[in-house]
Amino acid sequence: MRIALGQVNPTVGDLAGNVALCARFSRAAAERGADLIVFPELTLTGYPPRDLVEKRGFIERSEAAVEQLAEETAELPLTVIAGYVGRSKVKTGKQATNSAAILRSGAVLMRQTKMLLPTYDVFDEARNFIPGESQTLWKRGADNVALTICEDAWNDKEFWTHPLYPRDPVDELMQRGANLLLSINASPFNLGKRQLRIEMFRAMAHRHRKPMVMVNQVGGNDQVVFDGSSFVMDAEGNVIASGASFREDLVVADIATGKGDLRADFTDECDAVYEALVLGTRDYMRKCGFSRVLIGLSGGIDSALTAVIAVDAVGRDNVRGVAMPGPYSSDHSVRDAHAMAERLGIRCDTVSITPAYDEMVRTLAPVFEGTKQDVTEENIQSRLRGLTLMSLSNKFGALVLTTGNKSEIAVGYCTLYGDMCGGLAVISDVPKTMVYELSRVGNKRHNGAIPEAVFEKPPSAELRPDQKDSDSLPPYEVLDAILRLYVEEFRGVREIATELSLPLDLVKDVALKVDRNEYKRQQAAPGLRVTSKAFGIGRRFPIAQRYFENE
């Protein structure tokens, strides 16, 4: 059997466009002699559709898209498998199903419905879908093919020490005589995820002694980035075919001969994270209808990284920087911002906020009489910069990219309606220590566009004289180590202090900052997820609450 993996980048809700995309890939697969092409989970609707499935008519249009794809591929000498939103035959509960259809010669040969609906991290499928109760083997000549949808293959009872569900759908199908697994996925990227998929499917191949096919969606949809990285394994767990990472691909593998297309790119995890941010930015803009971006260039490392990512995502002609010096901005920061912009080949305007700041201070002076200057005056500067960027955004129709990193956002070292203003938080899931690593990646791609001084200068918001981040925060190496354990692994403060050999009071202080700044994060622009636990849709904490583990 020659199997093609249609690693496509669908757009959520664009049913006609997604059908056309699958039809185009199907024709290309037929030209390469494939007997079968397999597309990812919910390809025809895009993943995740979220509450779109609640809209009247959406399920019917999704099912009509299946019929349309069957019609458009009817004359092709191959079978097509694609994911879609179907309607449940059960009279109670949710009406939508996460399903897959097997198409041949214009007809639907079989349908399969996802049984295990994930409700962790960025997944909330039980909110919208009803699970399937049974599954069927696809009889294809002498072959018994197991077709599963994402999570149904992610509950191997021997691979995981604590499976999330009582059922193991793959094992059930293998016990019924399956000799091949086709797993269609919308599996998001995060650090280490590509290797985890390989290890998990290899364990299943070893256990069942059967070939494994894993096809994955590629592209960015809101906060989630899908890397593709599809693959085919033989019964020994050897990868015999693999798709590219972070781009569409058509991969053909011959199960009988054990040969297929092999691609291996972005093998370094830092390169992979950088490329995920580029893809996430590009797709967010493209799918939302934007073509140009605005970035506040401070001369610091965060805005520098955001700028090089933006240039890779949409091209230098569509990136516009704005330097906004204030009363405490250093001359070297303004020079560094313009030097980088010139090397990148992007436009950079200078709009001083000092006159507006001075006027604002004068305006508020009668009301502030008798008080000392504090963080209020610092935040006025940040909010004037936000106002400037949003005004330019309105005037020129460009999307503002915020430049805050995960470390700052975690502890609230950011200003609501100030530096948090924007439409997409590109590096909001990137810890500060990783910002430097990714900036080296971007700098290499752009021939040293980021001045070395930007890497070497102490981080500073420059909102008061001689200010440094270290005045308010622990060293970023220490802060990021605490945040990784507290935010991503949900570890307790005493456990963290012991493991990192840090003072308990320091860890408590960081944890309290994280907990008390939830209100800021819930008003932030959507951010691109690249770690195992990002702020956003995958981390849901109450704002009005009094459970502080550090007390």
Segment roles from a protein language model:
Residues 2, 209, 235, 261-299, ...:
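ATP/NTP-dependent adenylation/nucleotidyl-transfer catalytic domains that generate, transfer
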Residues 1-296, 312-313, 323, 348:
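Enzyme catalytic cores with a strong preference for nitrogen-chemistry domains
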